[in-house]
UniProtKB/Swiss-Prot annotation:
The active site is at 53, 125. Residues 7-136 form the RNase III domain. PANTHER family: RIBONUCLEASE 3, RIBONUCLEASE III. Its main location: cytoplasm. Its cofactor is Mg(2+). GO terms for cellular component: cytoplasm. Homodimer. It catalyses: Endonucleolytic cleavage to 5'-phosphomonoester. Residues 162-232 form the DRBM domain. This is Ribonuclease 3. It is an enzyme of class 3 (hydrolase). It comes from Leuconostoc mesenteroides subsp. mesenteroides (strain ATCC 8293 / DSM 20343 / BCRC 11652 / CCM 1803 / JCM 6124 / NCDO 523 / NBRC 100496 / NCIMB 8023 / NCTC 12954 / NRRL B-1118 / 37Y). One of its GO terms (molecular function) is ribonuclease III activity. Keywords: Cytoplasm, Endonuclease, Hydrolase, Magnesium, Metal-binding, mRNA processing, Nuclease, RNA-binding, rRNA processing, rRNA-binding, tRNA processing.
Length: 236
């Protein structure tokens, strides 16, 4: 996908058209490209990445504050950290085809940089920085509503949350509690993968169960289910 094709895509998909197209070009330009094109004016993406990181932090914090009025500071902080982890940004860069619009040097292109997570994480932040400078925070919010924020309802960010530690902190607020995880069931699936069921108990009282394709994932699912029960029943 050329830069012109990418511009057409974001216009059609997100109704985004840059007023200053040099900002978009800068956000999608890697340093090695400029090294190989010394006659070309402009910068690489790194300054916009710096700005985009701060914009993401602010807008995500504001979004969570408004969406979850009953959450305490610890819950808001944990979810914000999960959402602005750069590990998730590579996923969203691919989702909106930022990877296809990057201007790379020949060596980086040949080495597979276009699909390198670390670069895609940086480019996401640079794109957010460019969009903020060009059109302001409201347009950034609209874009994130269609991408990052929409993923909350799919439980996408659960992979970045340590539910076992959260459960331990919740249960031990009033003193020591013996928390135990047990593998209750193991099932062989038709695609040769395994499905595990795990339980979590506190002081020998089972709180919840969860399933996953590994024991670790099943225990995490059990902890998440237990937290949900505790949060829905504050007197437990």
């Amino acid at each position: 996908m050329s830069q012109d094709s990418f511009k057409s895509y974001i216009l059609k998909k997100f109704n985004i058209s840059f007023n200053d197209e040099s900002l978009l070009t800068e956000a999608l330009t890697q340093r090695n490209y400029l090294n190989e094109h010394p006659d070309e004016k402009g910068r690489d993406y790194q300054r916009l990445e710096f700005l985009g990181d701060s914009v993401m932090q602010m807008i995500v914090a504001e979004y969570l504050f408004k969406r979850y009025p009953d959450w305490h500071e610890g819950q808001l902080t944990e979810m914000r950290i999960a959402m602005v982890q750069t590990r998730s940004f590579a996923h969203f860069s691919r989702m909106v085809h930022l990877n296809e619009g990057i201007r790379l040097g020949k060596g980086e292109e040949m080495s597979g940089a276009r699909d390198r997570d670390s670069l895609l994480e940086d480019i996401w932040e640079a794109f957010i920085g460019a969009l903020y400078l060009d059109q302001g925070a409201d347009v950034v919010r609209q874009f994130l509503n269609q991408t990052l924020f929409a993923a909350i309802d799919t439980d996408f960010f659960d992979r970045f949350i340590d539910f076992k530690s959260r459960l331990q902190e919740r249960l031990q607020t009033k003193g020591s509690v013996d928390i135990d995880y047990q593998t209750e069931k193991e099932e062989q699936l038709s695609d040769n993968t395994q499905l595990f069921e795990a339980s979590v108990s506190a002081n020998d009282k089972e709180l919840a169960r969860g399933t996953g394709k590994s024991i670790k994932d099943a225990e995490k699912a059990a902890a998440r289910a237990a937290l949900k029960i505790l949060e829905d029943n504050v007197n437990l």
